[in-house]
Every structure is written in structure tokens, then in C-alpha cells.
Amino acid sequence: MTKNEIKIRKQIIEACLLMEKKGLNQGKAGNISVRWKDGMLITPSGISYEGMKAKDIVFVDSKTKPHGIWKPSSEWRFHFDILKARKEFDAVVHNHPAYGTGMSILRKDIKAYHLSLIHI
């Protein structure tokens, strides 16, 4: 691994820990992928973010072959297809915020409140 790859792997872990700290994720749910070389780096399946090391992040190459000591996230295909289809994206973040999940279970709409969503 190059220094740059190690740096990106560590940034993925930092982002996962931040998601958890901010309540956007709990336990082993959710995942992050980053475009890397001809494929992507992605969080492993079933591993908690606490104690995760750079070597635990999985590389999935352009032929969808995983490289690493763990299996890639169970949602790796969805990450892979997004990064393949949308060249302007360099990362995919998938999380399970408690309130969003609760609203979904209750079948409640979540209203969008952001200036970019206001139609003039």
C-alpha cells in the first residue's frame, strides 16, 4: 500500500467513526466507499468501526474481485455501480440514522428543508 492509499483508508475509518458519533449510524450498519485506481476501497462486511485498521478496508477492482482480508460490505455492488455510472462522484456514503430509519418504519414522509430545494 502506498502512503496515499493508507491515508484514504484511514479517512474512510475516520468518516465511519464520525457518522457513528453524530448518530448517523449504529454498530456495524452503513458503509463508505471511495473511488481508488480502477476500482474502489470499501468498508468490510460485519466489522465494527471501533478498532478497524487501514488494512481492514477492502479493495474491489474493476472486474469486481475483492482484495483484502475481509469480505467487502454486503452492499458493495450498489457502491460499485454508483461509482461506475457517476464519474463525478468519488465516494458513496450509506448510513442508517435512527430517526430516518424510525420514520421509514412508520411510513412517514421526511420533508426536505434546504434552500436548494425551494422552487422560485
Enumerate the language-model features and the residues they cover.
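Generic N-terminal amphipathic, Lys/Arg-enriched alpha-helix
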Residues: 1-2
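An anion-binding catalytic pocket shared by soluble metabolic enzymes
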Residues: 6-93, 111
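Short active-site loop/helix that positions an aromatic residue
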Residues: 99-109
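A short alpha->loop->secondary-structure connector
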Residues: 109-115
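Conserved small/polar residues in nucleotide/adenosyl-binding loops
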Residues: 118-120
